[in-house]
């Protein structure tokens, strides 16, 4: 360890010109290059990565099961969709069924929590 400390101390005392000369000498002696390898990213690889990183902004709210409180779920679906009572009941009876499409994340989460509070099972897609 003492030898390594001495080498470190000697290297630290080198001027920039001396360090460059040392690099050349070592490259020649060991047959290596100190230059960092250059990598070029392919546009075909970068595009899918950028898409994967972006967060989804619009969601589809899907009712997968009604649960025990079917009447309450129908009322919530009626309020969310603006449908009449009969249309809302039909939609709930046809579960799994899409309730609302192209909604923002916050609205989708709110709809999901309302339906789940009524005992329904909901997926966001």
From Swiss-Prot:
GO molecular function: mRNA binding; structural constituent of ribosome
Keyword set, alphabetical order: Ribonucleoprotein, Ribosomal protein
A Pfam cross-reference name: Ribosomal_L12
InterPro entries xref list: Ribosomal_bL12, Ribosomal_bL12_C, Ribosomal_bL12_C/ClpS-like, Ribosomal_bL12_oligo, Ribosomal_bL12_oligo_N_sf
Gene Ontology BP annotations: translation
GO cellular component, one term: cytoplasm
Source organism, top-level taxon: Bacteria
Subunit description: Homodimer. Part of the ribosomal stalk of the 50S ribosomal subunit. Forms a multimeric L10(L12)X complex, where L10 forms an elongated spine to which 2 to 4 L12 dimers bind in a sequential fashion. Binds GTP-bound translation factors.
Family under the similarity heading: Belongs to the bacterial ribosomal protein bL12 family.
The protein's role, per its UniProt record: Forms part of the ribosomal stalk which helps the ribosome interact with GTP-bound translation factors. Is thus essential for accurate translation.
NCBIfam families associated with the record: L12 (TIGR00855)
Protein name: Large ribosomal subunit protein bL12
């Amino acid at each position: 360890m003492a030898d390594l400390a001495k080498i470190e101390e000697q290297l630290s005392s080198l001027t920039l010109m001396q360090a460059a000369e040392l690099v050349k000498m070592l490259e020649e002696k060991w047959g290596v290059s100190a230059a960092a390898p250059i990598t070029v990213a392919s546009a075909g690889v970068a595009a899918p990565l950028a898409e994967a990183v972006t967060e989804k902004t619009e969601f589809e709210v899907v009712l997968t099961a009604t649960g025990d409180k079917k009447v309450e779920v129908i009322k919530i679906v009626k309020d969310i969709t603006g449908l009449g009572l009969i249309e809302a009941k039909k939609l709930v009876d046809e579960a799994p069924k899409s309730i609302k499409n192209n909604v923002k994340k916050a609205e989708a989460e709110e709809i999901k929590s309302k339906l789940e509070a009524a005992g329904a099972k909901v997926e966001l897609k």
